[in-house]
Curated annotation (Swiss-Prot):
Name of this protein: Translation initiation factor IF-3
GO MF annotation terms: ribosome binding; translation initiation factor activity
Cited Pfam families: IF3_C, IF3_N
Cellular localisation: Cytoplasm
Organism annotation: Pseudomonas entomophila (strain L48)
Source lineage: Bacteria, Pseudomonadati, Pseudomonadota, Gammaproteobacteria, Pseudomonadales
NCBIfam families from the UniProt entry: infC
Length: 183
């Protein structure tokens, strides 16, 4: 025996405001199409005013006494709200954490290249995670790793601030630097 499931739209939509004949109140506080207060009128009168203007009657605040309704083009209103939400979403900046891996014996040339990449990450507004991995007997000389991370910290002082100070996690020494706030 197979069980049929109803197809449903999985998009999460905000609850729509009651419009026109779906408004259940008998009296409403009416706001005109251009924003002027018309006052408290019966629902029939409000629907007539909206119909004459060839617009919709939309319930703005249902919990007010009496409910507040506005005469507006509901389709245009939904479009504007969706457009504003998309604009706000587009303007959000996702902060990423970029990682650069060092070794206790990182040579000067490699150090400068990695430092240049760290400067670029911080300038772009991303956080930088610096990890220093120890192998084998290098674990006996953890102070070399600490010195290297202190050097990175001083070299990047003008670009960022230390968010997480160096700490050991297993065989790795980790540090996180956040970009400085732009004024």
């Amino acid at each position: 025996m197979t069980i049929k499931r109803e197809m449903r739209n999985d998009k999460r939509t905000a609850p729509k405001a009651p419009i026109n004949e779906n408004i259940s109140a008998r009296e409403v506080r009416l706001i005109g199409a251009d924003g002027e207060q018309i006052g408290i009128v019966s629902i029939d009168e409000a629907l007539r005013i909206a119909d004459e203007a060839k617009l919709d009657l939309v319930e703005i605040s249902a919990d007010a006494q009496p409910p507040v309704c506005k005469v507006m083009d509901y389709g245009k209103h939904l479009f504007e709200k969706k457009k504003q939400a998309n604009e706000a979403k587009k303007n959000q900046k996702q902060i990423q954490i970029k990682e650069i891996k060092f070794r206790p014996g990182t040579e000067e040339g490699d150090y400068q290249v990695k430092l240049r990449n760290l400067v670029r990450f911080l300038s772009d507004g991303d956080k930088a995670k610096i990890s220093l991995r120890f192998r084998g007997r290098e674990m006996a000389h953890q102070e070399l790793g600490m010195e290297l991370l202190k050097r990175v910290e001083t070299d990047l002082a003008e670009y960022g601030t230390v968010e997480q100070h160096p700490k050991m996690e297993g065989r790795q020494l980790m540090m996180v630097i956040a970009p400085k706030k732009k004024k």
